[in-house]
Curated annotation (Swiss-Prot):
Pfam families: ORMDL
Gene behind the chain: ORM1
Disulfide bonds: none
Membrane topology recorded in Swiss-Prot or TrEMBL: Multi-pass membrane protein
Main location: membrane
Protein name in UniProt: Protein ORM1
TM region(s), chain numbering: 12-32, 36-56, 89-109, 111-131
Entry keywords, A to Z: Membrane, Transmembrane, Transmembrane helix
Species of provenance: Saccharomyces pastorianus (strain ATCC 76670 / Carlsberg bottom yeast no.2 / CBS 1503 / CLIB 180 / NBRC 10610 / NRRL Y-1525) (Saaz-type lager yeast)
Length: 148
């Protein structure tokens, strides 16, 4: 299955590694302050995880007979069982990153607004049970993102 790697050893560590690498990458740019570095790290991680877990439907492997063609990776995790340890971890990571980025942005209103909006509407809301199998189409932005 497409999402079995989420439960394997080391899958949780990769999120910390990706966040650390993003932070180091944004620190390399001259003129980027610590506030913007953390905000850009948060934005990149949140948008990347949205694309990976919620935008693309299906599976790259063809030995499942099309059973997962209409499911996102988030819906494929743990056979659609809600509130498993992996799902809880994937909900907590963006929230923790939001808190860290807000702290290092010295609670600046502009940075807080960016971080809060993205974390809430791009990272947390799509993972809630109320949005399970809910498809929202935004013309020009969300098209047919399906692996076939």
């Amino acid at each position: 299955m497409n999402a079995t790697w989420v439960d394997q050893r080391g899958a949780w560590i990769i999120h910390v590694v990706v966040i650390t690498l993003l932070k180091l990458f944004f620190n390399l740019f001259p003129g980027v302050t610590a506030e913007w570095s953390w905000t850009l790290t948060n934005m990149t991680y949140v948008v990347g995880s949205y694309v990976m877990f919620h935008l693309i439907k299906g599976t790259p492997f063809d030995f499942n007979g099309g059973a997962y063609d209409n499911l996102t990776m988030w819906e494929q995790i743990d056979d659609e069982t809600l509130f498993t340890p992996s799902r809880k971890f994937l909900i907590i990571v963006p929230i923790a990153l939001f808190l860290v980025s807000t702290h290092y942005a010295h609670y600046d209103l502009k940075m807080f607004s960016w971080n809060c909006f993205l974390t809430t509407f791009v990272a947390v809301v799509p993972k809630l049970p109320v949005t399970h199998r809910l498809r929202i189409s935004i013309p020009g932005i969300t098209g047919r993102a399906q692996i076939s």
